[in-house]
Design a protein with these regions (language model features):
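Structured, helix-rich domain cores that form ligand/interaction pockets
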Residues: 1-174
Length: 174
């Protein structure tokens, strides 16, 4: 959790929440009997500005095969309103153990990174391996699918409560 405050009231305060920070904030909100929606709406009512909002779905079973999804994009087998994609595979030049020979993970972006909406799909298990040295087979989350919303899109996703619910229902097929 990062909180950056400026003495200049016009600049306000920046709150940036990542994984553990989100869990800490969630505990705080639960203790207050508030939801993320309540918190975000309160921030907007107080004049807050949302620069980016990431909505994540964890793939615990390894359903998403990111290299295969990348191949589908390469062969124009992906049906989407987005017009572009980027795929990255990371690794090490000097491999310290046998497991590293397969690379350090794949990431697929669907949509322009400059647009207000794009998807990011990545191998979370490899990320955990690199950050915390957790063996890949021991990670609970295999992949992560994120919808990244910026500026107005982030604002309207929160402002119109049902938009988030409808979005997730479409993704999970409910």
């Amino acid at each position: 959790m990062f909180v950056l405050a400026s003495p200049d009231k016009e600049k306000g305060t920046l709150l940036e929440l990542k994984g553990k920070g989100c869990r800490q904030m969630e505990s705080y909100l639960l203790a207050q009997h508030r939801s993320w929606y309540d918190f975000l709406m309160d921030a907007l009512v107080e004049g807050g500005v949302m620069k980016r909002l990431d909505l994540a779905i964890n793939d615990m079973a390894g359903i998403l095969d990111i290299p295969e999804l990348t191949e589908k994009c390469n062969h124009e087998e992906c049906v989407s309103v987005f017009r572009s994609f980027k795929s990255y595979r990371s690794g090490e030049l000097v491999r310290s153990n046998e497991q590293d020979r397969y690379g350090m993970g794949n990431t697929l972006y669907i949509g322009s990174l400059k647009s207000e909406v794009y998807f990011c799909i990545y191998e979370k298990d490899y990320e955990q391996y690199m950050k915390y040295d957790i063996q890949i087979e021991d990670t609970k989350i295999k992949n992560r699918f994120e919808i990244r919303l910026k500026n107005e899109r982030a604002y309207y996703a929160v402002r119109v409560k049902d938009v988030l619910l409808q979005l997730f229902n479409k993704i999970i097929g409910a």
